[in-house]
């Protein structure tokens, strides 16, 4: 793969650490800023909101810029946001800094996906996107545990200082390595972009993304209590088991990209079907420790195997004007799916349903996503 692609991977790594490391620091943040854990947890929701809002807005505002300039500017925003997190004097300031940081997230991955596909031959486009997203999976496997450890040892602010340093390094390598001829989309104005987004085929792609990832996060949000209360693991075992999940993310991401290069429609349906099967098997399988560990890894693999295929699919449906915006909005759709899935899983639990049944209920999401995808494919053949 071309060297500039790994510059995008570095940016993805920094963004991934910044997004997820807060989950392991909520106790420390809450104690330092004088808020409850529940209130500190809203920093996660605030970030997701920033992604959903920032993806379309920043993509439209920077639509006429050369894509290299967009990527460098986004990493500057990301770095400034993390610096503001490290210096935040209050909870409100930290929330504002988290939202600022998140604004760059969706547009970086959206524009980065377009740039990545332009660096390789047509038959390797999905694999190129998968390589960029390897930064996100590496963040979960290596960056988040390391960032959590730094926060526990030296304070949560030290973690954000570290992520700021990663942002500076990513900005530099992107500025040096990404070619200057990474041009903006050929479009007249933002209205043309919006017409692309409103195409039925693009909207159905976005709905497929939302539904697929809602299934993942309806379960992953509650993976710790599933492992301890259903699987019978001690709390000390949760972190090592999550490393298995992270390994699954890496494997699934690369596999999904390679399969999508060979047969995109079959990969989309197949990965969503695999995700639904894993979720359904988790309900009986989590009652035995070996199968619980295996299924946790498979959840990561099946969930992230959908990412590159869904991203390249929306790019193919939005070919030409509006491609960057469609790609960025699809990243926002992943985050919307995360939020919907977490809400749905919590709703099931709140209604008194056994915790072990949540994965089975979550399987409804990828099953529905398959139906939407098949409808989209059928429309495309007409």
Task: Give, region by region, the residue ranges found by the protein language model.
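Paired small-residue
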Residues: 6, 77-84, 92-101, 290-298
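Helix-breaking motifs and short loop linkers at transmembrane-helix boundaries and internal kinks
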Residues: 34, 66, 87-93, 232, ...
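Conserved MFS/SLC helix-loop-helix module at the cytosolic interface between two early adjacent transmembrane helices
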Residues: 53-92
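Cytoplasmic helix-loop-helix junction between adjacent transmembrane helices
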Residues: 97-135
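Intracellular juxtamembrane helix-capping segments at the cytosolic ends
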Residues: 108-120, 305-319
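C-terminal membrane-cytosol helix-exit motif in multi-pass small-molecule transporters
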Residues: 164-184, 372-376
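C-terminal transmembrane helical hairpin of 12-TM major facilitator-type secondary transporters
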Residues: 266-310
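A late C-terminal transmembrane helix in Major Facilitator Superfamily
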Residues: 317-354
């Amino acid at each position: 793969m071309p060297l500039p692609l790994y510059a995008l991977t570095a940016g993805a790594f920094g963004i991934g650490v910044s997004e997820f490391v807060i989950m392991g620091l909520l106790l420390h943040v809450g104690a330092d800023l004088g808020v409850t854990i529940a209130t500190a947890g809203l920093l996660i929701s605030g970030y997701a909101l920033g992604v959903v809002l920032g993806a379309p807005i920043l993509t439209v505002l920077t639509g006429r810029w050369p894509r290299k300039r967009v990527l460098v500017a986004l990493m500057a925003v990301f770095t400034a946001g993390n610096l503001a997190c490290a210096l935040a004097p209050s909870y409100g300031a930290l929330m504002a800094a988290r939202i600022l940081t998140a604004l760059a997230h969706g547009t970086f991955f959206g524009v980065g996906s377009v740039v990545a596909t332009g660096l390789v031959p047509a038959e390797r486009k999905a694999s190129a996107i998968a390589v960029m997203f390897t930064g996100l999976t590496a963040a979960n496997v290596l960056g988040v545990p390391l960032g959590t450890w730094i926060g526990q040892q030296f304070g949560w602010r030290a973690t954000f200082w570290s992520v700021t340093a990663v942002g500076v390094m990513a900005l530099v390598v992107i500025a040096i390595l990404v070619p200057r001829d990474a041009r903006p989309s050929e479009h007249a104005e933002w209205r043309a972009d919006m017409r692309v987004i409103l195409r039925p085929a693009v909207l159905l792609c976005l709905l497929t993304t939302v539904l697929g990832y809602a299934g993942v996060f309806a379960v992953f949000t509650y993976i710790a209590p599933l492992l301890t209360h259903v699987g019978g693991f001690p709390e000390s075992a949760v972190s090592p088991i999550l490393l298995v999940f992270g390994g699954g993310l890496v494997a699934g991401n690369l596999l999904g990209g390679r399969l999508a290069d060979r047969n995109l429609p079959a990969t989309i349906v197949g990965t969503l079907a695999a995700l639904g099967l894993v979720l359904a098997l988790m309900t009986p399988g989590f009652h035995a420790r070996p199968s619980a560990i295996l299924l946790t890894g498979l959840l990561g693999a099946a969930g992230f195997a959908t990412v590159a295929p869904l991203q390249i699919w929306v790019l193919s449906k939005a070919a030409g004007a509006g491609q960057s915006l469609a790609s960025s909005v699809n990243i926002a759709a992943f985050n919307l799916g995360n939020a919907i899935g977490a809400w749905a899983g919590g709703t099931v639990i709140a209604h008194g349903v056994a915790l072990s049944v949540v994965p089975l209920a979550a399987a409804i999401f990828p099953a529905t996503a398959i139906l939407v995808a098949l409808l989209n494919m059928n429309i495309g053949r007409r």
